[in-house]
UniProtKB/Swiss-Prot annotation:
The lineage of its organism: Eukaryota, Metazoa, Ecdysozoa, Arthropoda, Chelicerata. The presence of a 'disulfide through disulfide knot' structurally defines this protein as a knottin. Coiled coil: none annotated. GO terms for molecular function: calcium channel inhibitor activity; sodium channel regulator activity; toxin activity. One of its GO terms (biological process) is defense response. Residues 1-22 form the signal peptide. It comes from the Eukaryota. SUPFAM superfamilies: omega toxin-like. This is Omega-hexatoxin-Ar1b. Residues 23-37 form a propeptide. This toxin comes from a female specimen. It is observed that propeptide sequences coming from female specimen have only limited homology with the male paralogs, but the reason is unknown.
Amino acid sequence: MNTATGFIVLLVLATVLGCIEAGESHVREDAMGRARRGACTPTGQPCPYNESCCSGSCQEQLNENGHTVKRCV
C-alpha cells in the first residue's frame, strides 16, 4: 500500500467514524431533552419555577437556616 492509498483509507475511516459519532450525539441530545422535559420536582424540594413541580404549585417557605426559599407543595 502506498502513501496515497493509505491516506485515502484513513480519510474514509475518519469520515465514517465522524458520521457515526455525530449520529450518536444527536440521539443522546434528544433523549436527554425528553428526560428533562418529562421530569418534575417532588414535594418539599426547592423549585425555581412553578411549572417544574409535580404538583404544579411552588410556595415560599423558611428553610432550616431561616432563609426564605421556594419549595414545591
